[in-house]
Amino acid sequence: MGAITLDGKATRDEIFVDLKQRVAALTAAGRTPGLGTILVGDDPGSQAYVRGKHADCAKVGITSIRRDLPADISTAALNDTIDELNANPECTGYIVQLPLPKQLDENAALERVDPDKDADGLHPTNLGRLVLNNPAPLPCTPRGIVHLLRRYDVEIAGAHVVVIGRGVTVGRPLGLLLTRRSENATVTLCHTGTRDLPALTRQADIVVAAVGVPHLLTADMVRPGAAVLDVGVSRVDGKLAGDVHPDVWEVAGHVSPNPGGVGPLTRAFLLTNVVELAERE
């Protein structure tokens, strides 16, 4: 008997139905939300990702605001674009698409974004608000993970969650989300310096793999019946591969596919952050 699929696409569609109604109410009140993107250069992956975000906007009625800039843009010109979106009343929230070309300082660009227009929830101010449990846009991927677990009635309160990966977009903020009183999980954050990773993952009720190492998590590392979320993305022989080996499906109780699991919810909660920012205005 295989694991239950944590279906991110179906869950995203449910979220979009809700967002469409909320956007319609905001529009009727004269406050249509707008999502902005700043894309520098012509990286195919980044272009596809931005196109997907704006296609999502069209589905729920959010206004799209695109700023596509040349790869050789100066820091001053990028700053001008960020400042313009900070001041643009039609732009409720926006993102600076990463990676940026090498001549640009990514951290400086992200810090220049108005924290109250931070659609990704990754501005240093908003990460600080998360630590303090103050209202702020939440990081999209961690929020999607928590939502997906709840959608499929995976018990979070009291659960031991092992997160593999300490990146700023997933691992670190996910630990903060899961240890809030509203979630009440116990979190072990693992990384390249962790000793005996399999011993830790075998104790876990929930494992989140977010490192970008193909098929890192194998069946012998998973406790029977555990929930496993596959977040990392890499390429093997030109094809997308996740961090979770296919044999895990025969042992785990729940597994998120990759693609089609957490990824769709990352995009859904980007839009959710924008709608919530509009509702606060």
UniProtKB/Swiss-Prot annotation:
Record keyword NADP present: yes
Transcription regulation recorded as keyword: no
Pfam families linked: THF_DHG_CYH, THF_DHG_CYH_C
InterPro entries in the cross-refs: Aminoacid_DH-like_N_sf, NAD(P)-bd_dom_sf, THF_DH/CycHdrlase, THF_DH/CycHdrlase_cat_dom, THF_DH/CycHdrlase_NAD-bd_dom
An individual GO BP term: purine nucleotide biosynthetic process
Residues annotated as binding NADP(+): G165, R166, G167, T192, V233
Assigned keywords, A-Z: Amino-acid biosynthesis, Histidine biosynthesis, Hydrolase, Methionine biosynthesis, Multifunctional enzyme, NADP, One-carbon metabolism, Oxidoreductase, Purine biosynthesis
Disulfide pattern: none
Family, per entry: Belongs to the tetrahydrofolate dehydrogenase/cyclohydrolase family.
Protein name (Swiss-Prot/TrEMBL): Bifunctional protein FolD
Source organism of this protein record: Mycobacterium avium (strain 104)
